[in-house]
């Protein structure tokens, strides 16, 4: 897959004079190196976009392919059927922009093994530094940077005049500028201290953070503030405020933005580490270029006191999961897929350990709706969805494909024959892994001796006239037949 590059424009009023805008284009190159292209446009644009800024973080990495149906099935950002969204697990960041970056991470899984490992190693690092400022201070800096006022060149006479004027009246505008400048000076000093304290054996992501701080601060005029006003109690002069306001919001606006982005990334890593520690998640699942896929001690992250299970793709490229209704087949499929999804985000997974291929795509067919508008039945929706995901497999992508209860919208004989036909087709796509749940035991037994298939079942049984469902995943094919018992048990009160 070719690298996906998000090219961006940072549009910012220069305020050097009223003759135009400075437009900076950033493009990500290699290891976070940035190319800044400077363009100028006419006064006409300045009239329409005074002090306007649009900031988008550039990216140069490859992403795992998926679709809206899969994200809905896994409840990535929105829960269905009263399920919690997966994002809510990791939404407890210290900053608002950290929350936005976490959302970006969890909705955009990677298929770049080095980028995934880089995130994992940083999250697992026990000596992650604290954020240099608290949430309120960082929010104030964001507000200050976007504050819509005239940025002026530093001038001693103007500074003295404005200082005298402010003795006579309270100036809210000046307070915003003064506090914003003071906080950025404090921020730059603390970031420089963080850089100096970065250990030689620190993870690559933290070393890159330290190098970015070094290049940004000491490779520009920002180095002037290092050593100045480290304490909040000391206040810079009015001329100094004007000087650095011009430096921060005009000349090096984009550099300050870049440093803030690094802080939010640190916030994301700290939050993910906190989740891993509190929930016992695995920070570093082993990502591999082979098709080995196995998980030990996995659970669905939102099941209360859920039983942990072990699973692996032990045979071929197809795993058929059987079991009675209510045994937990769909939840198990979701738990496995969520673990694979989070592993590709570089985030901790709800398991003790995991070996996971780096997939090109993840696709599911779990909660398919009917369509009254299109006149499409549930059965037809299933057929079209299976066709859609198999086209992805046919394209040569290495995919994880989840099919939950294929062809439940038709009669048992049709469902059996259709499932067998689909399974024969799946065997051709050796570069993909397929997890299929079914309650049609005849379908599973049809492939019992096929080397392309492995088999697991969710245990359930009737014991002392009670339905026992331990949610235990076991190798083999289920023999449980409890449907009639459940119907009889629930309806027996209707008999007179």
Question: Where are the regions that the model predicts?
Answer:
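Conserved amphipathic alpha-helical "coupling/scaffold" segments
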Residues: 57-221, 255, 262-265
